[in-house]
Structure formats: structure tokens, C-alpha cells
């Protein structure tokens, strides 16, 4: 990949902040689990060809970040870009990269100033909020990693389409929490999928939840009338949840390259198992517990729920 020529003019210095690592660095690379090794192998096999894309589905906390970092290494990626929905994730990615002994220059494109952020400063990351400076910075670094938020997508597009010195095409673009970009093309974030807007030789999408469902109704509607005795006939009817968005769209997200479910992670001891505690209060318990004739039906039921939660916490030693 050719390096961009030097710019005719440099942006103002306030648009970039420079920092250097201050904390002791790790000396050993992180060990990979079997599922991560399989995920990396599948990802590299598919993305070896340019102009390909694919997605990985793995439970939260199972190491998708490390999987993507190692895959980029095996693919020989030089200009590596990572898109995330939140500022906190930028810091997490930078920390994970340094913990895995990656030493390439890093820059963040967001509202964060790396020099003022303890994690990014410790990682030695630079930062900017200007697409023009990003293009100039990438021209000076033949191997580098760019972290940016979805909200800063326009700055990336600006850098790659600069008439003065366009930024190079990314060898690999990773989209974290990729389910947030699924759905209608009216979302600004869907520009991540468009190679004419954000040029990248390869795209890798990461998620733990490839399907986005409509939030269920968790409470009964308020009422001023008498509350009927709860029976099968009077119990609320819960409609089946509506699927709002899915990543099962190969033209956008590519094929699924690897799956590591929450259940598999629990079985393997990667994640802790959990128990679901459902507090309940019967109508008889409600009548004996609440005797205030002035309280409305909604207030009585709300109070009962509070008591049920306290009871469950006491019984479960929470």
C-alpha cells in the first residue's frame, strides 16, 4: 500500500494531543483459548481475500477484542481501524492492544483528548477531532491503528476523501457492537457498511447479540379501577417480541465466521453461571400485607413489588 504524500499544510496543533506510555508494560502475550483459536483461524481464512467481510458472534466477556487483534496480525494488516459506539470502548481497545504487546502508533478520533485520559495516555495514544489531521498522521505512519466512535464517522470519511492528501484505504475495519448498525439505512452509522464512503479492504463485525428485539412490556398499565383477581383469563397477554434488526444479511455483514454462545462459555468455565430469581406476591399476601384503604391499586401493587424484591434479596442473601 502506497504511503500518502506529505501535506501542503499542517493543521493547527490544538487539533491533536500527543502522549507517551507511563506505566510498566506487560512482557508476555495473552494466551488464547481453543474457541478463540478457532475463531481467529476461521476469520483469517475468510478475510485473507481482499474485499471480503464477515461477522463473529461471541458472548460478552469472552475475548472478541483479542480475537480481532490477533486476526489483524495474521492478516498482515498495516492500517487498522476500529469503530466503536462509545468512548469507554476506545479505552478498552487501546488497553487490550497494549496488553497483547502491540506497539504500533495509535490515534483516537473522538471528543476525547488522549493526554487528559489516564488510560489512553498510558497506552501512548494520540488523538484528534479533525479528518484533515488524521490523513496527515496516517501518511506519517505506514503501520498504525485508528480507534473512532460511530459519532465521529464523518471525520473518517473526511480524511479518506480529502482532496489534498486522502488517507489510505484501511487494510481492516473492525466494527464492535455491530448490531447497533443493523436495521434501517436511515441510520447515519450505516455508512460503516459502504465501501465507497469508508474504504477498507476487509470488514469484520463483532457482536454478542446479532438480533435486536423490541423491548418487552414489563409492567401492567396503570389503572384507576378495581384490580380483578388474577386468573388465567385476566392475566396480561404478552405478545411475541418483534424483531427490529438482524445481522443475518450477508451482503452487509458477510457470513458468520464464528459463534461462541453464552451457554458454551458457561460450560467451558469462561463465564460464571447465573440464577434467575423471580419475586412473586400473591393476591392473598397482598391483602394481608397492605391494609391502607386510601392507597390506590397501582400504589398497592408497586409496594408489593418492592416487598417482594426485599424478600427475595433476604432469602437469596444478595
Report each predicted region and the residues it spans.
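Conserved helix/coil segment N-terminal to the catalytic DExD/H
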Residues: 131-169
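Conserved helicase motor
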Residues: 108-129, 149-155, 180-183
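SF2 helicase catalytic motif II
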Residues: 150-152, 163-205, 209-212
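Conserved interdomain linker/interface between the two RecA-like ATPase lobes of SF2 helicase motors
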Residues: 241-318
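Conserved pre-motif I regulatory segment
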Residues: 17-55
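Conserved Walker A/P-loop ATP-binding site and its immediately adjacent core
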Residues: 70, 74-101, 108-113, 150-152
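Walker A/P-loop
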Residues: 49-72
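Conserved helicase ATPase motor motifs in RecA-like P-loop NTPase domains
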Residues: 57-61, 179-181, 195-221, 225-238, ...
Amino acid at each position: 500500500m502506497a504511503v500518502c504524500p506529505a501535506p501542503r499544510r499542517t493543521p493547527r496543533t490544538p487539533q491533536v494531543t500527543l502522549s507517551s506510555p507511563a506505566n510498566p508494560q506487560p512482557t508476555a502475550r495473552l494466551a488464547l483459548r481453543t474457541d478463540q483459536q478457532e475463531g481467529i483461524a476461521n476469520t483469517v481464512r475468510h478475510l485473507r481475500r481482499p474485499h471480503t467481510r464477515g461477522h463473529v458472534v461471541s458472548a460478552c466477556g469472552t475475548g472478541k477484542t483479542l480475537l480481532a487483534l490477533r486476526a489483524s496480525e495474521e492478516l498482515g494488516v498495516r492500517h487498522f481501524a476500529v469503530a466503536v459506539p462509545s468512548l469507554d470502548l476506545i479505552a478498552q481497545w487501546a488497553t487490550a492492544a497494549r496488553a497483547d504487546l502491540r506497539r504500533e502508533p495509535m490515534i483516537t478520533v473522538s471528543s476525547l483528548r488522549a493526554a487528559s485520559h489516564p488510560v489512553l495516555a498510558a497506552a501512548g495514544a494520540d488523538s484528534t477531532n479533525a479528518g484533515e489531521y488524521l490523513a496527515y498522521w496516517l501518511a506519517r505512519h505506514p503501520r498504525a491503528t485508528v480507534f473512532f466512535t460511530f459519532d465521529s464517522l464523518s471525520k473518517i470519511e473526511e480524511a479518506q476523501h480529502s482532496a489534498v492528501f486522502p488517507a489510505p484505504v484501511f487494510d481492516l475495519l473492525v466494527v464492535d457492537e455491530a448490531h447497533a448498525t443493523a436495521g434501517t439505512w436511515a441510520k447515519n452509522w450505516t455508512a460503516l457498511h459502504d465501501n465507497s464512503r469508508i474504504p477498507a479492504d476487509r470488514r469484520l463485525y463483532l457482536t454478542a447479540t446479532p438480533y435486536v428485539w423490541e423491548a418487552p412490556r414489563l409492567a401492567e398499565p396503570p389503572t384507576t379501577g378495581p384490580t380483578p383477581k388474577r386468573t388465567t383469563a385476566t392475566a396480561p397477554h404478552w405478545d411475541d417480541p418483534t424483531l427490529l434488526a438482524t445481522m443475518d444479511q450477508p451482503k452487509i455483514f458477510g457470513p458468520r465466521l464464528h459463534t461462541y454462545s453464552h451457554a458454551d462459555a458457561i460450560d467451558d468455565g469462561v463465564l460464571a453461571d447465573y440464577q434467575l430469581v423471580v419475586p412473586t406476591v400473591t393476591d392473598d399476601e397482598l391483602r394481608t400485607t397492605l391494609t391502607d384503604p386510601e392507597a390506590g391499586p397501582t400504589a398497592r401493587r408497586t409496594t408489593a413489588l418492592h416487598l417482594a424484591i426485599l424478600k427475595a434479596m433476604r432469602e437469596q442473601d444478595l
